[in-house]
């Protein structure tokens, strides 16, 4: 169960202090690191970071899947090049078979849930979704069935909803049950998303946004907006709340990272009264 992960960098190396948490956030145990340098010319060098890692015993059968290996390669490169966040949710690539971008959607849902009245931290919510990696995968499957231009299927939406409900009935811990049901409600409440949109060069947009029917999301404080849009990216998070189909409003830069939705909701209440 010992594997080697080799990272090649052009004219740049990676310190062990930076590489260690990135590798371990994917669920590997880092055993050693051997650096090599290949000199191409006076000004050009290739640095090779050879990481020796231990694969969790229960995942040895999965790690030989070529599709999963490609997902891991893409995700690890994305984490080292700061295209995705490096946090423990990246374990969902190895444990749940999700791609780096699919994990980013789950991460966006976690960030949104942390802004609601759910009495748990983003870290605890993440731990729960990692523990129930199968449900996290089903949540993405539900999202895909609702919004993917190629795989949209109302029948499949209903089938996946029934599967998730059956899995939720097996959860015994009250806190975990509350978190998973809240995540389920978020996906069910989604109306639109930019997840599948691409730029002119064919790459995905560097941010993910989703529009929700607020009244369908569990644990939201009253009054409920009619709709809200949450935006997640590596650089920032944002929310847009609407009290009605026609509404006045404005922009606000918030320093309240942990509860900016509460701040914006207060402003919306004031606008609705006016």
Feature locations, PLM:
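Extended, well-ordered protein cores
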Residues: 1-274
């Amino acid at each position: 169960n010992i594997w080697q992960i080799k990272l090649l960098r052009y004219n740049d190396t990676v310190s062990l202090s930076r590489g260690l948490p990135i590798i371990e956030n994917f669920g590997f145990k880092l055993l050693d690191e051997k650096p090599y340098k290949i000199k191409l010319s006076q000004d050009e060098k290739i640095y090779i970071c050879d990481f020796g890692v231990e694969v969790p015993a229960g995942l040895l059968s999965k790690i030989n899947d070529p599709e999963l290996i490609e997902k891991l390669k893409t995700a690890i490169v994305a984490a080292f090049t700061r295209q995705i966040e490096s946090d423990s949710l990246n374990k969902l690539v190895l444990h749940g078979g999700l791609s780096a971008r699919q994990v980013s959607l789950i991460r966006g849902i976690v960030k949104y849930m942390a802004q609601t009245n759910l009495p748990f931290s983003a870290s605890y919510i993440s731990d729960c979704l990692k523990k129930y990696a199968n449900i996290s995968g089903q949540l993405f499957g539900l999202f895909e069935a609702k919004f993917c231009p190629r795989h949209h299927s109302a029948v499949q939406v209903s089938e996946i909803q029934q599967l998730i409900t059956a899995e939720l009935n097996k959860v015994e811990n009250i806190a975990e049950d509350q978190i998973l049901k809240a995540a389920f409600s978020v996906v069910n409440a989604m109306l639109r998303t930019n997840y599948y949109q691409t730029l002119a060069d064919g790459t995905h947009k560097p941010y993910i946004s989703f529009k929700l029917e607020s009244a369908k999301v569990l644990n939201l404080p009253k009054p409920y907006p009619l709709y809200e849009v949450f935006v997640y990216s590596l650089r920032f998070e944002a929310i847009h709340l609407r009290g009605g189909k026609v509404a006045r409003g404005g922009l606000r830069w918030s320093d309240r990272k942990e509860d900016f939705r509460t701040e914006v909701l207060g402003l919306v209440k004031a606008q609705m009264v006016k």
